[in-house]
Each structure stands twice: as structure tokens, then as C-alpha cells.
């Protein structure tokens, strides 16, 4: 594989401007780099590129330039990570609420360039809903709005071209984002369903209500069992309660441990709002044969999300290669897409004579009016495979 010839660490817009000028003068290819968490191969260097390639690391441009509490806006440099941004805003009582799985390492500029979506988009929106102004430096100058605007109804907004641009139009240096006051209450909840299809039906009905929580996720049976296997061994009273809960679910309710799936929820806002959401969504789950599984399981499910990348890196030491992929699917095609993806992976696994059996699981991390996002995780044992 090709590698970059040089890496530049920029600390200001002046340095970015000068670097772009030099790149144009000497015919050098620049590739912006943020957290490096992209899974779309956008950072893979083009095989046919013959120019010198320079990676431009923007992570030193990581400051919050200003906060406007009255208008609930903040101007933030593009190299800041999600984790740092939320920690610094929280010191002033604010948050952005954009929380992709990669929030620990991914950057604001990267979110814009990849048109990212966060797990709490139901409450705070996707990145295109959060951003009100973008500053991007191009070979022909700086592109930005004169002032951030709440909404524009006349003419085109050039900044909209930057969402999903993957660094092809210039280097994003900062953005004005919408901020929110820290929520009064944050609660987790969870529910288990007898089958994946039951869980999907629940999500479909939930999407048509007025009590959709900040985040809702549905994991299939394989991912559910994987999460259960990683749970710490309970002791004392927790051990008794865990055994009792397991007895109720498997014996009294009759759920099959090899078919059941689980949904997890995050609710944020005022206490009354959160209580309303929790009561109604668990009642709806019950109508779909769902069983409330408690806040701790909900919280653990979300914590596992952030641990997956570390688990993947750990398993690579033992020749197990893991990866993820996701796609948007209309409600009517969910089961079909999951089945086709499973069949295709098994087919390719056999075709290339890879040992063992692949791990493949899926989850629905986001719901929309017309469909969902399906997130696939797979792993294969690759020892001895070139």
C-alpha cells in the first residue's frame, strides 16, 4: 500500500493557507487528517496518484474560539475531538450532543467531511443540523458565510457542499455549532424481545410516536450474547438478582436465549419529559412482547459501543480481524438486507477458504421516518491467510 511522503501539523489558518499555496505551486497532493476513525476507506491513498502526498494533521487546531450563550452558538476549531469538545463545553454548562461511536477520537472537521451521524441524533440532529457556518480554505481562498444563520431560504448555501466532501474541496478549519444546555436528567433503559422481528416491529411503531428518546438501539441475538459474555461476574446481592432476572426471562416468560434480542435507550431532558418517554416506550415494548431489562443493562450496552474498537485491536493480536459497515435501509427491507448480507459473507468466507466460521452480527443504531441505519460487525480468523 502507498504511504504518505510527509506529515504536516498545522496550528493556524495562516499555516493552512500557506501550505495550500505551496502545494499548488509544487504540485503536491494534500490529504486532511483528523482522528483517523473513518471506515469508508476515504483515507486510503489513491493507487494512481503520482504526486508527492502530504497528510495535513489538524488536531492541533483544537480550541473553542467563542461561546455565545444568548444565541446558543459556539465557534470551534475543526481539529478538536468530540470528547475534548464536550468536556470543555460542559465547564460552561453546555453540550453539542453529537455522539458517534468514535466520539473519543473523531474530530469536528471529520464529522463535517464525512457527514457524520451521532447516536443521539433524535434529540440533537445529525451533523448537518448542528452546523451553522463552516470555514474551509481552498486553493482559491477562504469559503465561509459572513455570519452564521439559523436558516436561509434564498439561494444556495455553498457550505452544504462540504458535508460528505471527504477533504476534496479544501481543508476545514473551524465551524459554528449549535449548543444546548446540559440536560437536567439522563436515564438509561433496556428491553428484551423474543425475536429480532418483534424488536424491529417495536422500533417501527416507536418511530411514529412523540416519545422517541435521544437514542434507541436494537441488537440482534449474536450481539446480545456477545455483550452478555463480556459482563462482569456478579457477586452478592447482584448475583441473586441476576439469577432471578434470568429465571424470569427464560423460564416464566419463555424467551429463547438463542433467538431473543435487546433494545437499549438513552433519554435526556427535563425530568418530566424523560419520565414520559420512559413510561410510554416501555409500555409500547410490552405490547410487542418486550420485557423491561433495567437501566444498568441499557448503560452497559452503550458503554460496550465505545469498547468495541479496543476489543477489535486486542483480538488482532490473535489473528482475528474485525471490521464494521453500515447502510441505510427502508423499513420494508430490513430483514431482507440482513439475510442477504449474512449469506454473502458466508459465501465469500467459504470461497476464500478462511478457517473457522465468521462472526457476523447487526444492530439498528438509528431510526428515521422512512427507514433505519443497519450497522454490521464481522470478524474472521486470518492466521495463515495472505
Residue ranges and their predicted role:
Residues 1, 200-386:
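C-terminal substrate-recognition/cap domain of FAD-linked oxidoreductases
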Residues 39-41, 105-109, 224-225, 245:
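Beta-rich nucleic-acid/ligand-interaction surfaces
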Residues 2-4, 68-71, 182-187, 259, ...:
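Short glycine-enriched loop/turn motifs at secondary-structure junctions
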Residues 1-59:
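Glycine-rich N-terminal segment of FAD-binding domains in flavoprotein oxidoreductases
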Residues 62-219, 231:
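FAD-binding subdomain of flavoenzyme oxidoreductases
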Residues 5-11, 179, 187-194, 265-267, ...:
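Short, well-ordered beta-strand elements within core beta-sheets of diverse protein domains
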Amino acid at each position: 500500500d502507498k504511504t504518505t511522503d510527509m506529515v504536516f501539523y498545522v496550528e493556524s489558518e495562516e499555516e493552512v493557507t500557506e501550505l495550500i499555496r505551496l502545494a499548488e505551486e509544487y504540485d503536491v497532493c494534500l490529504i486532511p487528517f483528523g482522528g483517523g476513525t473513518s471506515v469508508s476507506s476515504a483515507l486510503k491513498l489513491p493507487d494512481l496518484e503520482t504526486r508527492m502526498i502530504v497528510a495535513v494533521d489538524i488536531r492541533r487546531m483544537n480550541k473553542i474560539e467563542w461561546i455565545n450563550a444568548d444565541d446558543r452558538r459556539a465557534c470551534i476549531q475543526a481539529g478538536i475531538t468530540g470528547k475534548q469538545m464536550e468536556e470543555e463545553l460542559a465547564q460552561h454548562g453546555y453540550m453539542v450532543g453529537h455522539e458517534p461511536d468514535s466520539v473519543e477520537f473523531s474530530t469536528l472537521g471529520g464529522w463535517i467531511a464525512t457527514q457524520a451521524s451521532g447516536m443521539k441524533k433524535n434529540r440533537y440532529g445529525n451533523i448537518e443540523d448542528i452546523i451553522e457556518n463552516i470555514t474551509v480554505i481552498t486553493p482559491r481562498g477562504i469559503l465561509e458565510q459572513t455570519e452564521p444563520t439559523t436558516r436561509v431560504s434564498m439561494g444556495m448555501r455553498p457550505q452544504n457542499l462540504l458535508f460528505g466532501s471527504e477533504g476534496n474541496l479544501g481543508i476545514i478549519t473551524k465551524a459554528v455549532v449549535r449548543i444546548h444546555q446540559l440536560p437536567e436528567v439522563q436515564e438509561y433503559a433496556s428491553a428484551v424481545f423474543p425475536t429480532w422481528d418483534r424488536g424491529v416491529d417495536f422500533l417501527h411503531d416507536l418511530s411514529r410516536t412523540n416519545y422517541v428518546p435521544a437514542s434507541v438501539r436494537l441488537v440482534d441475538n449474536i450481539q446480545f450474547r456477545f455483550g452478555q459474555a463480556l459482563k462482569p461476574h456478579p457477586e452478592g446481592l447482584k448475583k441473586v438478582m441476576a439469577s432471578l432476572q434470568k429465571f424470569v426471562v427464560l423460564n416464566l416468560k419463555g424467551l429463547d436465549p438463542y433467538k431473543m434480542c435487546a433494545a437499549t435507550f438513552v433519554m435526556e431532558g427535563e425530568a418530566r419529559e424523560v419520565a414520559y418517554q420512559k413510561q410510554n416506550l416501555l409500555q409500547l415494548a410490552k405490547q410487542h412482547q418486550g420485557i423491561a431489562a433495567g437501566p444498568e443493562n441499557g448503560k452497559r450496552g452503550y458503554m460496550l459501543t465505545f469498547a468495541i474498537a479496543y476489543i477489535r485491536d486486542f483480538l488482532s493480536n490473535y489473528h482475528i480481524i474485525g471490521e464494521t459497515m453500515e447502510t441505510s435501509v427502508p423499513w420494508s427491507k430490513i430483514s431482507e438486507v440482513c439475510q442477504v448480507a449474512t449469506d454473502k459473507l458466508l459465501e465469500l468466507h467459504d470461497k476464500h477458504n478462511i478457517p473457522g466460521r465468521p462472526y457476523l452480527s447487526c444492530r439498528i443504531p438509528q431510526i428515521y421516518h422512512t427507514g433505519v441505519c443497519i450497522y454490521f460487525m464481522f470478524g474472521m480468523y486470518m492466521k495463515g491467510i495472505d
